[in-house]
Amino acid sequence: MEYIKLGKSDLKVSKICLGCMSFGEKSKSLPWTLDQEQTDIIIKKALDLGINFFDTANCYGANGSSEKFIGNSFKKFVKDRKDIVIATKVRWNEGKTSKEAIMREIDGSLKRLQTDYVDLYIIHRWDYDHPIEETMESLNELVKSKKVRYLGCSSIFPYQLLKANMIARQHGWAEFISIQNHYNLIYREEEREMIQLLEEEKMVMTPYSAMGAGRLCRLYTDEPTERFKDDPNAIFKYAQAKDLDIPVIKRVKEVADKMKISMALVALAWIYSKPYVAAPVL
């Protein structure tokens, strides 16, 4: 396993971040999640392979149970908390990043994860109903209290990222060091403005959906996976762009066949060729 420093932080992370959205108790919107036994198997295998970077959220699995499940797994398989880097997120449970919500949600996450701190605390989306000054000040309080080591953001626009970091800079607060946005061979919107901003801010990306929800791993088929039968987010992201995606997917297949490797490796090689990408969430 190769490791990389996460942006301007001192976090040394594996170049693969294990996404933990698939772990947790099933719910109406997440009927495909894996139980504790299956979670243990995957977490143990990841650790054995040298993966030390894990990404979850307070809303993954019913009642935030992804955090609970991986917390249980870490208790079983991790001897020293410093050996792993845990990222979790805040917003969806309460739909906001007000001070009250942030303070409640971090305590809930820490309890479920069975840890005293998280290494990277990410705002899951922008909160249009509360001032970003309130959000950044509250997040800074978490850093000062040592409940959180570093801050990140997810799925926000470049102007929002710059605004948040400039406000933090003006007040001497902790800034966002990384962003987790949607980015892969068939979705490259971030190349319009976000990438240039990341380079100027000396930030890094930990992109999600590096495989395009599996679309970059095989030739296109109209037969849906279990997740695509039930997950409105996955359907929304890719179903409408099928005709645009298929030529790219076919080209990935051609390259994979020529190199005698899997399509997934081609998609990953493309992601890893980008200097602003630290570790894709897989």
Question: How should each PLM-predicted stretch be described?
Answer:
Residues E189-E226, S262:
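Aromatic-lined glycan-binding groove of carbohydrate-active enzymes
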Residues L6, L18, T39, F54, ...:
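Conserved, mostly hydrophobic/aromatic
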Residues V143, D230, Y238-L282:
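Conserved short secondary-structure transition element at the edge of the structured enzyme core
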Residues C20, T56-N58, T88-V90, I122-R125, ...:
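A cross-domain feature marking catalytic cores of carbohydrate-active enzymes
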Residues K26, N93-E189, E193:
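Glycine/proline-rich, positively charged
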